[in-house]
């Protein structure tokens, strides 16, 4: 089942489960306390948009109702949501109405920012954050109302963030290029003009929109420039992994697959989804996974296995779904020993748990339980093979999914968390993982390059190497996918720079890969998927078809590695 379909029909647990285990790797008994929910509503804060754009729009993302979200809404998220001072989304009563973006209940959080999809013509119809220049917003007193100019708030927040990055980068020896400086200067000048006419909402909004246009471009350009600056002053990173999944193996000629795969990649992930890998409990079907593994290792490709545990409906057979929690723990220990020992030292890493923070939780496990499952798997994997790396894989860094779950009590009882919060929980609980994994599909971040890397940087503080475990974007429609109805032609403004095509897919890949490669705390980037039509993102493969037709993005990966080496210090 697709994630967008799952979101429509799934719901979260409303109560905790007390558990016990006889395993050699016991976990603590878990109880979820009953809670009394307080009234946290205060005065109303309204962010009023001024639609100064020239096109037909839409220019501000909105949904009719959180109760009626459908597939098209999930494919192109457009709802507003609030975030805290650590940029973690949280449930609130924020909603876009005809009057603007309204919020009056932040669930007790004193300071917050808002996140909206806003159309900056010439750049994109994309998610961005207003956070009052990093000082954040507070709700008015009960019974009061305050109205802010949305255009102005977005502009001054983005300009402030750019200033912060520029100051940081200059301290590290970088200087903006002649090409970049006009974007920075114009964003500042237009914002200064907007401040001078702040009492004239229309004029302020127009000037703010111009500032926002230049600041969005400046934000991306300065991140890319700084990346190339860092690449040039450091040695080439021979140990950096460029990888991809192997789902195309067996769906195209295997010799052709191996040739094209190993020409581009030195890292591979082999999936072990239970419906095909373990349709019946304790009966393992390794199938061509062993063949893939052997061929890849012979070619010198480093391999990761994934996942040991994933509670999504797509990958949870009935025999596992029907287990008690204590029996799930016993199964997890047994399963971990089996797969880790099967491949031995030749397997570089195992993804111990996948997407445990989000709504794909058909087993209705609580965050604390998922943390304990991760801890158990990490301990058992290490006990089975101390040499294997242990990776936690998270998705949806934007965490907009937090807002679309309507039961307020669910959120107040903290039964869903962001990826950043889940890693923090694992770290604080002593989960013995060695790699932090984060997915960065464009269609699931819906953020520009600057926001994407800043969000990812929050993971540095946990002190683990970071892998971009899954990354990708579409190459746009093809004649076949349009005629078949699998890919609908857009009826809204483009989301990033222009409409997606093969060249834009390659441009996005080149820019975000360069930024990520330049960060010494990131050890790998893995594109998903290799070949269409088997890609998770529609038309998101590097090969256009199983016959091996190469897209521009495939060529760009190979050229990019050569360019990094050429520009490096040594």
Spans of features found by a protein language model:
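Aromatic- and acid-rich polysaccharide-binding/catalytic face
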Residues: 262-275, 280, 348, 354, ...
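N-terminal substrate-binding region of glycoside hydrolase catalytic domains
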Residues: 60-103, 239-290, 295, 301-325, ...
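C-terminal segment of N-terminal export signals and the immediately downstream linker at the start
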Residues: 1, 21-44
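Aromatic-lined carbohydrate-recognition surfaces of secreted/lumenal glycan-active proteins
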Residues: 243-247, 375-414, 467-471, 524-529
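Substrate-binding cleft and catalytic face of glycoside hydrolase catalytic domains
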Residues: 269-279, 290-366, 371-399, 478-479
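Amphipathic, heptad-repeat alpha-helical segments
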Residues: 37-87, 123-188
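Aromatic-rich peripheral "rim/lid" segments of glycoside hydrolase catalytic domains that contact
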Residues: 342, 351, 356-376, 380, ...
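N-terminal export signals
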Residues: 5-28
């Amino acid at each position: 089942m697709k994630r967008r379909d799952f979101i429509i029909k799934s719901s979260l647990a409303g109560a905790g489960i007390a558990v016990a285990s006889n395993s050699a790797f016991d976990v603590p008994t878990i109880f979820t306390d009953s809670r009394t929910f307080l009234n946290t509503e205060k005065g109303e804060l309204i962010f009023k948009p001024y639609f100064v754009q020239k096109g037909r729009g839409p220019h501000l993302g909105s949904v009719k109702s959180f109760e009626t979200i459908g597939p098209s809404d999930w494919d192109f998220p457009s709802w507003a949501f609030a975030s805290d001072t650590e940029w973690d989304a949280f449930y609130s009563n924020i909603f876009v109405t005809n009057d603007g973006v309204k919020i009056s209940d932040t669930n007790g959080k004193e300071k917050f920012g808002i996140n909206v999809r806003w159309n900056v013509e010439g750049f994109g119809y994309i998610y961005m954050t207003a956070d009052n220049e990093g000082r954040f917003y507070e709700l008015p007193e009960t019974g009061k109302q305050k109205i802010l100019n949305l255009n102005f708030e977005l502009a001054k927040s983005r300009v402030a963030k750019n200033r912060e990055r520029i100051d940081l980068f200059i301290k590290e020896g970088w200087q903006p290029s002649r090409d970049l400086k006009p974007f920075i200067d114009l964003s500042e000048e237009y914002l200064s003009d907007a401040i001078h006419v702040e009492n004239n909402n229309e004029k302020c909004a127009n000037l703010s929109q111009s500032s926002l246009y230049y600041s969005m471009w400046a934000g991306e350009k300065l991140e890319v420039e700084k990346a190339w600056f860092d690449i040039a002053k450091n040695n080439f990173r021979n140990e950096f992994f460029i990888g991809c999944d192997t789902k195309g193996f067996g769906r195209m000629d295997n010799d052709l697959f191996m040739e094209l795969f190993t020409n581009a990649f030195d890292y591979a992930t082999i999936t072990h989804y239970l419906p095909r890998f373990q349709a019946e409990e304790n009966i393992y079907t390794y199938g061509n996974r062993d063949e893939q593994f052997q061929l890849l290792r012979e070619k010198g490709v480093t391999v990761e296995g994934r996942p040991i545990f994933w509670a999504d409906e797509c990958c949870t057979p009935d025999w596992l779904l029907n287990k008690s929690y204590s029996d799930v723990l016993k199964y997890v220990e047994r399963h971990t020993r089996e797969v880790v020992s099967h491949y031995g030292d030749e397997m570089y890493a195992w993804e111990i748990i996948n997407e445990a923070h989000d709504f794909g939780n058909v087993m209705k496990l609580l965050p604390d339980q998922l943390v304990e499952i991760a801890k158990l798997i990490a301990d058992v994997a290490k006990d089975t093979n101390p040499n294997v790396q242990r990776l936690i894989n998270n998705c949806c860094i934007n965490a907009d999914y937090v807002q679309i779950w309507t039961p307020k009590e669910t959120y107040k009882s903290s039964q869903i968390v962001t990826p950043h919060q889940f890693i923090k929980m694992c770290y604080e609980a002593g989960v013995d993982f060695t790699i932090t994994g984060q997915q960065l599909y464009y269609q699931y971040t819906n953020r520009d390059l600057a926001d994407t890397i800043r969000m990812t940087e929050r993971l540095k503080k946990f002190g683990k190497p970071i892998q971009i475990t899954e990354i990708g974007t579409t190459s746009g429609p093809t004649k076949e996918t349009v005629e078949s109805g699998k890919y609908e032609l857009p009826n809204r403004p483009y989301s990033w720079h222009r409409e997606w095509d093969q060249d834009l897919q390659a441009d996005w890949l080149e820019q975000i890969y360069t930024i990520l490669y330049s960060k010494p705390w990131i050890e790998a980037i893995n594109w998903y998927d290799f070949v269409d039509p088997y890609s998770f993102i529609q038309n998101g493969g590097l090969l256009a078809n199983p016959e091996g037709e190469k897209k521009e993005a495939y060529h760009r990966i190979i050229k990019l590695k050569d360019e990094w080496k050429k520009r490096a210090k040594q």
